[in-house]
Structures are given as structure tokens and as C-alpha cells.
Amino acid sequence: MKLPMIDQLEKLTGHYFKDKKKLKKALTHSSVQGSEQGNYERLEFLGDRVLGLLIAEMLYQLFPQASEGELSVRLNSLVNAQTCADIALEMELPVMIHVGFEMKNLKGRRLTNMYADVIEALIAVIYLDGGLESVRPFIQRYWQSRAKQMDAGRRDAKTQLQEWAHVQGGVQPHYRVVKRSGPDHDPVFMVEVSIPGFASEIGQGNSKRCAERMAAEKILRREGIWETMEKNNHE
């Protein structure tokens, strides 16, 4: 790895890298053939756990009144692939990633996942270099402002309910129309949303989408997710 690139990464992360070989590995995709130093997959595995721990710690400190459910939703939003990929782009990491020829034209979700994997691998290298105390400033630098700005209580209710349901046990909300009434030009839909292990709720609206959103909002409020988020966002 060229010295200017290492210098740039050290400025971006605020960390002096002791193990340059691991740093190179963190930026190498498995599609690179004959790579002696290996690829980032094992580092990504470790970095994912370190990121989750430090984000959980940060949220616990930032939102002392938040319920476990709210913290889980916020955690999921901050460690998901899209957020990590956004940070990779902010750091201009994509130009530093080594990939095989067949991966040069990667697009969409697979590209997002690769960027996220590299961020997590980079976190692992910092952790192996200096432990949690070395990683914490990096996490605070790129994630803390996102955590503070996140108005989770006002995000799309269906998306938030899906995230909340996932952290409850990997389940998904199921929506079904239970009734449709009114004329074609002014219909009224009643939609039931159910989640395994929880009581269902029914929402009403002039479209299926609106009724689904209303039903999702009812569960979020009933379970205390929106209530605590709204309280925290006004403090």
C-alpha cells in the first residue's frame, strides 16, 4: 500500500496503523486472485461485533430515558449496510478498495454491502491495533452526529416497524386488507398488521398504503417505541 494512501487513512480515522499488512487486507476483496495477504472477510466479522458494541454503548449514554425497544431500532439504523456504506463514501474509501476484475462493475445492493464490509474490516484493524479505546474516537467521529440527528420517531412507520420486528426475533410484519368500503372515488381501507408473538392492530385510510401506515403507527405507540423517541427528541 502506498504511503500517501496510508497517510490519508490515518487522517480520516485519527489512528496510526501499526499493522500495515492488516490494513491492506481490510481493503482487499476476496475476488482478488493470488493475494498473499488475504482478504477482509475475517476482519469484517470481527469489526461488525466491535461496531455493534460501541454503537450500543454510545446510544445507552446519549439516550438515558430510551427503552430497550427504541435503542434496538436506533442501533439497527446506525449499523446497517446503508449507513456504513454512506460513511465509506464520506471517507472516499471506494477508490482504495482492491477488487478482482469481475467485481469492477458491481452495482446496487452488492456494492453497498462491499463498502459496508470494508468499513467494518477497518474498524477491526483499529481494534486489533489498540483495543476499544482506539476505535471509540473513530466511531464518535462518524456515527455520533448521525445518532444525534436521527429523528427516529418521525421516520416512515412501516420501515421502523419492520426494523423493530426484526430485532425482536427476526420476524416480519404482515399486512392484510380486512375491509374495503365507500365508492371507488373515495374508498376506505381497513388493514390489519400482525407480528408473531404480538397483538395485531388495525389502521384505516383512503388507500392501502395509508391504512398500513396507520396500523404500523398504532403498534409503535402501543409498544412505547414512538412515545419514548418523541420524548427524547424534545429533550
UniProtKB/Swiss-Prot annotation:
Keywords: Cytoplasm, Endonuclease, Hydrolase, Magnesium, Metal-binding, mRNA processing, Nuclease, RNA-binding, rRNA processing, rRNA-binding, tRNA processing. Residues 6-131 form the RNase III domain. It is an enzyme of class 3 (hydrolase). It catalyses: Endonucleolytic cleavage to 5'-phosphomonoester. Its EC number is 3.1.26.3. One of its GO terms (molecular function) is rRNA binding. This is Ribonuclease 3. It comes from Bartonella henselae (strain ATCC 49882 / DSM 28221 / CCUG 30454 / Houston 1) (Rochalimaea henselae).
